[in-house]
């Protein structure tokens, strides 16, 4: 589960930071972890879109 420290408040699109191999590193619209994408989820107006549960573990931008 992506963003495991804070849970997936938006279902598949976890609130917070999606780190390498799906670990959670902090929260908010900041980049953190190794090759990660953070934000409020895919399509929530965040600068960094992260499809938690789809490609977040690899740090893909959507």
Curated annotation (Swiss-Prot):
The protein's UniProt keywords, in alphabetical order, are: Keratin, Repeat
GO CC, sorted alphabetically, is: cytosol; intermediate filament
Q: Which GO terms describe its molecular function?
A: identical protein binding
Instruction: Extract one GO BP annotation from the record.
Output: keratinization
Q: Does the keyword Repeat apply?
A: yes
Task: Extract the InterPro entries matched here.
Answer: KAP6 (IPR040313)
- State whether it acts alone or in a complex, and with which partners, per the record: Interacts with hair keratins.
What PANTHER family does this protein's entry cite? KERATIN-ASSOCIATED PROTEIN 6-2, KERATIN-ASSOCIATED PROTEIN 6-3
Record's function text: In the hair cortex, hair keratin intermediate filaments are embedded in an interfilamentous matrix, consisting of hair keratin-associated proteins (KRTAP), which are essential for the formation of a rigid and resistant hair shaft through their extensive disulfide bond cross-linking with abundant cysteine residues of hair keratins. The matrix proteins include the high-sulfur and high-glycine-tyrosine keratins.
So what family is this one in? Answer: Belongs to the KRTAP type 6 family.
Q: What name does the UniProt record give this protein?
A: Keratin-associated protein 6-2
């Amino acid at each position: 589960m992506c963003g495991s420290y804070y849970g997936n408040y938006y279902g598949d699109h976890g609130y917070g930071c999606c780190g390498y191999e799906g670990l959670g590193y902090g929260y908010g619209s900041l980049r953190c972890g190794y090759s990660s994408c953070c934000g409020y989820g895919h399509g929530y107006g965040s600068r960094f879109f992260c499809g938690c549960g789809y490609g977040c573990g690899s740090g893909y931008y959507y």
